[in-house]
Amino acid sequence: MSQSHLDDLFDYTEERCLWQFFSRTWDREENIEGVLGQVARLLTGQEPLRGTPQERLFYADALAMANDVRERFPWASQINHEEIHFLIDGLKSRLVDTVIQSSTNRELNHHLY
């Protein structure tokens, strides 16, 4: 995995995925973990989790993202399962840093939300 692969995925996610911008910190964390966990499962050929309505929601977003990743980035089919997990973990970290920790939106942690 290279830094450019992570940059590609981050740019794609920032541009195309609205689930990262939910209104509360816990929503954003839950979506980042849930959707990207399902993306990792799909890209590594594992069966996605679909036992609960929440898992099915994450799966729906992940399916579109995984298909786009395969279509847009030729390197996605050339990296192994370990590299995919490493890449997704790096993407999760960067998203948390960008959309939660570095966010200036004070409503993310407002006590009335």
Swiss-Prot record:
Catalytic reaction(s) noted: N2 + 8 reduced [2Fe-2S]-[ferredoxin] + 16 ATP + 16 H2O = H2 + 8 oxidized [2Fe-2S]-[ferredoxin] + 2 NH4(+) + 16 ADP + 16 phosphate + 6 H(+)
EC code(s) of this entry: 1.18.6.1
Keywords associated with the record: ATP-binding, Iron, Iron-sulfur, Metal-binding, Nitrogen fixation, Nucleotide-binding, Oxidoreductase, Vanadium
Any one Gene Ontology molecular-function term assigned to this protein's record: ATP binding
Gene Ontology terms describing biological process: nitrogen fixation
InterPro entries: Nase_V-Fe_dsu, V/Nase_d_su
Cofactor field: iron-sulfur cluster; vanadium cation
Subunit structure: Hexamer of two alpha, two beta, and two delta chains.
General function of this protein: The key enzymatic reactions in nitrogen fixation are catalyzed by the nitrogenase complex, which has 2 components: the iron protein (component 2) and a component 1 which is either a molybdenum-iron protein, a vanadium-iron, or an iron-iron protein.
Name this polypeptide is given: Nitrogenase vanadium-iron protein delta chain
Native source organism of the sequence: Azotobacter chroococcum mcd 1
